[in-house]
Amino acid sequence: MADDMDSIMGFIMGNKQRERVVQILGSKGKMESDKVAKVTHIPAPSVKKILAEMAERDLVSEENGIWGLTVAGAEIEKELKKRG
């Protein structure tokens, strides 16, 4: 699991926008992708792509248009806080 965590942390930390999306969902909770875009000041199409990439890695999930961190995503958010 440590290798997986390091790999996922590299994926998130390698892109400031991904890092910001994780932080916002962690601090503000579940929200629509357009709201994530507004809060992070990242263009909506970019946010949608970021969320899709993160969903492929089971870091976020979507239900009825509302996105939130999964258990794995919450662990990554905690690790980001430690490393931050």
Predicted regions and their residues:
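Short amphipathic alpha-helical interaction segments
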Residues: 42-55
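Short, amphipathic alpha-helical interaction segments positioned at domain boundaries
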Residues: 74-84
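A short, conserved structural fragment
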Residues: 55-65
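Minor-groove-contacting beta-hairpin "wing" of winged helix-turn-helix DNA-binding domains
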Residues: 65-72
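Short acidic, hydrophobic short linear motifs in intrinsically disordered regions
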Residues: 30-39
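Short helix-capping/hinge SLiMs at alpha-helix to coil transitions
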Residues: 25-28, 57
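Residues within the helices of the helix-turn-helix
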Residues: 23, 34, 65
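Short alpha-helical segments that sit at the start of domains
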Residues: 1-21
